[in-house]
């Protein structure tokens, strides 16, 4: 009989980095909250908690199907061991199904078609499930699956402010949700979704005191930034996705029409309105930008008070990039470790963000790298 190899534990940031790059195979796919397929945001993932940090880990992607990492079925205490062959690398737990998913609006729309739980305590919604970019093959972002969940009947095309307020109130009261992410497909018009978001966040704030991040492309008129803030938005995300013009034109030809320079002008206008660290941008590592290019742009962002939320690219089934390789854990480590140092040195820490993707941190190991760099204390709590 061969001896069982002793456990070899990875640090939390190492384990999260490995699993998010390679995905996992599940012995019991029914464990925890049902995983998402399609839609905006983290899709084809499953929420798992590692060392107190809830993260999104790919389970339905091509790399995940061949992943060397296996998550065992939960034991009697709800813990599952993560193995690579005979080696135990760590443990995960699965957040439970939220209670607000059992409710419907008066007109019969399930709450889960209006907003969903991300991570452990974050409510997320795509206010407008259609997008001018997605509807054109020559303009679509090749990584995006915003239309998939709509086509499958898992969501509705337009969420009203009243619906969003109703669901947000229930999610806070029943499941202890602590903040909300509100994104949108880009509609026709120069406000690029800011108007819909302002109306929507006002609908939520009328029903419940819940911090909300809004996410859109930079509007042509930066006055919309103040209007969203005045409507109740606590934080703002304007997502570059990729940092170099060449990669942006190749991967997201429609969205690339709004240049990197325009994004930086919008960032500089937004930071005085929302505050340092309350403006963020999502950067997908692994689309073609180099480590140095991502870190160089991140430095520019940090210097003006914008939080660069760098996540590993995860290919989503049914998109043009479904077979695109994921970045290696080594590639992500080469970005996340120095980036975490930049953020901690600048006082831009995820723990201080009021709402949104950077605060949630589930799609990247970045916040755990911050903690390793000594960035676990909250500046806001000390003030």
Give residue spans per PLM region.
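Auxiliary Fe-S-binding modules of radical SAM enzymes
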Residues: 1-84, 273, 295-383
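Generic detector of short, locally flexible boundary/turn motifs and exposed helical patches
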Residues: 42-49, 88-91, 107, 144-148, ...
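N-terminal [4Fe-4S]-dependent radical SAM core
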Residues: 54-142, 147-156, 354-373, 382
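Short, flexible helix-coil linker/hinge segments at the edges of structured domains or between repeats
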Residues: 138-140, 161, 205
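Glycine-rich anion/phosphate-binding loops
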Residues: 155-166
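Conserved AdoMet/S-adenosylmethionine-binding subsite of the radical SAM
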Residues: 165, 169-174, 179, 183-324, ...
